[in-house]
Design a protein with these regions (language model features):
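Structural core segment of the AMP-binding/adenylate-forming
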Residues: 2-14, 19, 113, 117-181, ...
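Conserved AMP-binding/adenylate-forming core of the ANL superfamily
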Residues: 37-38, 55-89, 95-101, 105-109, ...
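Conserved AMP-binding A3 loop
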Residues: 67-69, 200-240
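AMP-binding/adenylate-forming catalytic core of the ANL superfamily
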Residues: 128, 132, 142, 309, ...
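Conserved pre-ATP/AMP-binding loop-to-beta segment of ANL
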Residues: 186-204, 211, 252-259
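Gly/Ser/Thr-rich phosphate-binding loop
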Residues: 281, 306-311, 322-383, 396
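Conserved ATP/PPi-binding loop(s) of AMP-dependent carboxylate-activating enzymes
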Residues: 390-394, 405-436, 471-473, 515
Length: 566
C-alpha cells in the first residue's frame, strides 16, 4: 500500500483519515482485513442511498428511459412478491438468466433486497451448462427472458419462474409468472436484515477447463469492489483538477453527468460491479446495448454524452476501425479502460490518439476476487502501460515460487491474493475451494511479478505455459512482445503437441495493415530468444471470444491441428 501512495499521491489524499475512502483494519469473519471505513453494512445500503437520485435517468435501453424512482418502485415490488408470494427465505438462491436489459438489473436488486442470493447465469451458454449452473447453485427460482426460459423448459427445468416478456407463451404456464404482473405489488414494510457477512451473489468461473464453479460473493465483497471502482473514478476527477489547476468542485460542475456504456455482460463481475452498481452509487446513467455493434456504440457515446468506456481489446479495435468511416463527437469521454486481456502497445497508442480527452486505464482481477485487485489510470497508468496497474489498498498480493516461498521483486511466480474482495469459496465445492484458498490466500493460477514501484505485471496463466524442448514459454510474454509490432491488431499464442520438442509455439494474429509473415518472423527473432520464436504464424480476420472477452485459444488450436491433418 505504501508503494501505491508514493506513485499516486491522489490516492493518498482520498484514503487519508477522514477522507471518503479512508482505509482501516477490521476483523471480519475471524480475519483481519483492510476495509473502507465508510463501507455500508450491506449492498442494500447502496440501493437506499441511490433512491435519493429520484427522477434522474438511470437506465437507457432502446426507447426506454428508466428513472431511479421508477427503477426502485419496480425492484421493491419484486422483492415483496418474492418474500410474500413465493416465500423466499434469506440465503436461498434465485437465478437471473437474461441478456442485458433493465429487467436484469431490477431482478438483481429485487433478489438481494429480499435476502436472496442472486445467481448470475451466463445467458450466452448452451442449455446444458445453464441447467448445470441451476443445479450446482441449488437455485429455487428463476427469473429469465422468454428465449432462455424456453430452452430451460425444453430441457426439463421445472423450477418456478418469472419470465420477462409481454404476451408470453408462458402466460398460461402455471409454473411461470409474467414479470410485469408482479410490479404492482405493494413494497415490504419491514426490510430483511442483512449484514456484510451474508452472501449476495454467485458468479460462475469461465469453466474453460471443466465445469464452471459458482464463486460465492458476500455483501462485503461486492461493497468493496464497488467502492474500489468509485475511488478510481474519483481519481480521474482529481487528475483533471490538477491538469487544469482548479478545484475539484469546478471540474465536477463543468463535466457532463457520469454515464457509462454497458458493454460487459451483467453476469460478469465487470458488468455487475464496475458499471451497474458503481454508476448507481454516483447517480450515473447506464446505456444498455442489445448486442455489440461498434457503430451504434459510437453513436450512443455522441448522443448520450457517455463519459466512461470500458471494454476488451476486441471492442476497442472495433470502435477504432468504425471511427475511420464516420466522424463522431467523442469529447464527453473522460475515461477509457481496458480489461479481459492485456492491450498491445499499438492499441494503447490508437486509443490515446483517438480519445484525447480521456484518461487511459487498466486493471487485473477475476471472478473470485470480485473484480479488480490492481488498477491504474491517467498518469499512474502511463508510467507503466504494460502493467496491470498498482495493487489496490484493499488487498495484499504476494508472488510465490514452485516451492511456496515468496519471490523477490521482479521475479515471476504465482500471484496470491488476500483481502476484502476475495470470495467466500466455491459453492458446495469444498475440495476445489481448498485447492485455491490456503491460509487465507487465494492462489490465482496466474503468473506475474511486482516491480519496485508496486506495479503488478501479468506474465501468464500457469496453465497457459508451453514447455518446448525443456524450456518454459509463457504465452502472455509472446503476445505482449510481438503485440508491439505496428501491424499487429490482436494476437494469441498457444501450444500444440510436437514429437520432438514436446510442444511447439504457434501464434494467430489479425492485422491492421498488410504484412508478410516473413516480416513478423524477422521481428520475432530480433525481440525473442531463439526457443521463443513461433514455429508458425496464422493470419486471421477475426477471433472467437469468451463471454468475458478472452480469445478462445482451444478453437484456434483445434483449427490448426485440423489444418495440419489435411
Amino acid at each position: 500500500m505504501s508503494k501505491t501512495k508514493e506513485i499516486d499521491p491522489i490516492l493518498t489524499k482520498l484514503m487519508s483519515p477522514g477522507a471518503p475512502f479512508e482505509v482501516v483494519e477490521k476483523t471480519h469473519s475471524g480475519r483481519s482485513l483492510r476495509v473502507f471505513s465508510q463501507s455500508p453494512e450491506s449492498v442494500c445500503a447502496i440501493f437506499n442511498a441511490a433512491r435519493t437520485h429520484g427522477n434522474k435517468e438511470f437506465i437507457i435501453h432502446n426507447d426506454a428511459r428508466v428513472t431511479y424512482t421508477e427503477f426502485f418502485r419496480r425492484a421493491d415490488a419484486l422483492s415483496a412478491w418474492l418474500v410474500t408470494e413465493k416465500e423466499l427465505l434469506k440465503g436461498q438462491s434465485v437465478a437471473i438468466n437474461m441478456k442485458n436489459c433493465p429487467e436484469w438489473m431490477i431482478a438483481y436488486v429485487g433478489i438481494v433486497q429480499a435476502g436472496g442470493v442472486a445467481v448470475l447465469i451466463n445467458s450466452r451458454n448452451d442449455t446444458e451448462s445453464m441447467m448445470a449452473a441451476l443445479k450446482d447453485s441449488d437455485t429455487v427460482f428463476v427469473i429469465a427472458d422468454e428465449k432462455r426460459l424456453t430452452k430451460l423448459r425444453d430441457s426439463g427445468c421445472d423450477l418456478p419462474a418469472l419470465v420477462s416478456a409481454p404476451d408470453s407463451q408462458f402466460a398460461s404456464d402455471k409454473n411461470s409468472t409474467l414479470f410485469d404482473s408482479v410490479l404492482t405489488h405493494a413494497p415490504m414494510t419491514t426490510p430483511v436484515n442483512l449484514t456484510q457477512t451474508d452472501n449476495a451473489s454467485m458468479l460462475f468461473t469461465s469453466g474453460t477447463t471443466g465445469r464452471a464453479k459458482a464463486a460465492i460473493l458476500s455483501h462485503l465483497n461486492v461493497i468493496s469492489s464497488v467502492m474500489n471502482t468509485k475511488m478510481a473514478m474519483e481519481t480521474i476527477i482529481h487528475r483533471l483538477a490538477d491538469q487544469y489547476d482548479t478545484a475539484v468542485e469546478v471540474i465536477k460542475e463543468h463535466m457532463p453527468p457520469p454515464c457509462g456504456l454497458l458493454i460487459y455482460p451483467l453476469f460478469h463481475v465487470s458488468g455487475l460491479t464496475s458499471v451497474f452498481l458503481t454508476n448507481m452509487t454516483i447517480g450515473g446513467k447506464i446505456v444498455v446495448m442489445d448486442r455489440w455493434d461498434a457503430k451504434q456504440a459510437l453513436e450512443l457515446v455522441e448522443k448520450e454524452k457517455i463519459t466512461a468506456l470500458s471494454g476488451v481489446p476486441a471492442t476497442h479495435w472495433d470502435m477504432l476501425n468504425a471511427i475511420k468511416e464516420t466522424d463522431y463527437d467523442l469529447s464527453s469521454l473522460n475515461s477509457v479502460s481496458n480489461g479481459g486481456q492485456a492491450a498491445t502497445q499499438n492499441l494503447l497508442k490508437n486509443i490515446s490518439e483517438t480519445y484525447p480527452n480521456a484518461q487511459l486505464g487498466a486493471g487485473y482481477g477475476m471472478t473470485e476476487t470480485t473484480g479488480a485487485v490492481s488498477q491504474a489510470n491517467g498518469e499512474a497508468f502511463m508510467r507503466a502501460p504494460q502493467s496491470a496497474g498498482l495493487v489496490l489498498p484493499m488487498v495484499d498480493i504476494k508472488i510465490i515460487g514452485d516451492d511456496g516461498n515468496e519471490m523477490p521483486l521482479g521475479e515471476a511466480g504465482e500471484i496470491c491474493i488476500r483481502g476484502a474482495t476475495v470470495m467466500q469459496g466455491y459453492y458446495n465445492r469444498p475440495e476445489d475451494t481448498a485447492k485455491v484458498m490456503k491460509d487465507g490466500w487465494m492462489h490465482t493460477g496466474d503468473v506475474g511479478y511486482l516491480d519496485e514501484e508496486g506495479y503488478l505485471y501479468i506474465v501468464d496463466r500457469k496453465t497457459d505455459m508451453i514447455i518446448s524442448g525443456g524450456e518454459n514459454i509463457y504465452c502472455a510474454e509472446i503476445e505482449q512482445t510481438l503485440g508491439q509490432h505496428e501491424a499487429i491488431k490482436e494476437i494469441a499464442a498457444f501450444g500444440v503437441h510436437d514429437n520432438r520438442l514436446g510442444e511447439k509455439l504457434i501464434v494467430a494474429l489479425s492485422l491492421n495493415m498488410p504484412t508478410e509473415t516473413e516480416q513478423l518472423d524477422i521481428y520475432a527473432r530480433e525481440k525473442l530468444a531463439d526457443y521463443k520464436v513461433p514455429h508458425a504464424y496464422i493470419i486471421t480476420d477475426e477471433f472467437n471470444y469468451t463471454a468475458t472477452g478472452k480469445i478462445e485459444k482451444h478453437k484456434l488450436r483445434k483449427a490448426f491441428l485440423d489444418a495440419e491433418k489435411n
